[in-house]
Regions:
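Active-site core of bacterial EAL-family cyclic-dinucleotide phosphodiesterase domains
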Residues: 1-55, 92, 153, 210
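Conserved long alpha-helical elements within nucleotide-processing catalytic cores of c-di-GMP signaling
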Residues: 53-54, 63, 138, 142
Length: 211
């Protein structure tokens, strides 16, 4: 915890945002990218996000780090749209960030600062957003969508990401968890599950992304 705090205090030293490409399944052309947070600790070297992100969320440090990640991701997006105006950057947002009253205005300021349009940004959320305070979370998502930013449900098929949540949440994109994708060639269940979710989403106007 102290090492994370020191990194934040020293202008987010050791933190980096990597961009993982997202491609169209039919053509292989790049559609956009997902912003991935990485941290290299001075004392222990690279630390897995599985280890440090829960600590950030538990301690509340995710608020400043989340804003830094969002702004850095928008900055990277601004560079990408110079080559592809339709490039879309997907940025993960935590439950804690959605409870921050200043976060929505921060989104506007970040996009304005880097000259990025709402159509180029996608906000992703995970199951942690639905542990409690659903009303506040859903309202935040609606306000984000009103800006013209699309909402993506991450890790669908695991944890709290159920059909019930899909029905309630104003999601524009569903990302099927890699647990169902990695064995798609050998698992009949995984193929059937993916086919079902894809057809269901397309029938109601929701895009699908396979991780």
């Amino acid at each position: 915890t102290e090492l994370l705090h020191d990194s934040i205090k020293h202008n987010f030293k050791g933190f980096e945002v990597h961009c993982q490409p997202q491609v169209y399944a039919d053509s292989g052309f790049i559609k956009g990218g997902e912003a991935l947070l990485r941290w290299k600790c001075d004392e222990y070297g690279p630390v897995s996000p599985v280890e440090f992100i829960p600590i950030l969320e538990k301690t509340g440090m995710i608020a400043p780090v989340g804003k830094w990640v969002f702004d850095e991701s928008v900055r990277i997006c601004a560079k990408c749209i110079k080559y592809n105006p339709d490039f879309k950057m997907s940025i993960n947002v935590s439950y804690v960030q959605l409870l921050d009253d200043s976060f929505l205005s921060f989104i506007d300021k970040s996009m304005h600062r880097h000259g990025v349009l709402a159509k180029n940004i996608i906000v992703e959320f995970t199951e942690s957003c639905f542990i409690e305070e659903r009303g506040i979370v859903f309202e935040a998502f609606e306000n984000i969508r009103k800006k013209g930013i699309k909402i993506a449900m991450d890790d669908f098929g695991t944890g709290y990401s159920s059909l019930e949540v899909l029905k309630e949440v104003p999601a524009d994109i569903v990302k099927i968890d890699r647990a169902f994708v990695k064995n798609i060639r050998t698992s009949n269940f995984d193929r059937t599950f993916i086919k079902f979710v894809v057809e269901l989403c397309h029938d109601v106007g929701i895009e699908v992304c396979l991780e």
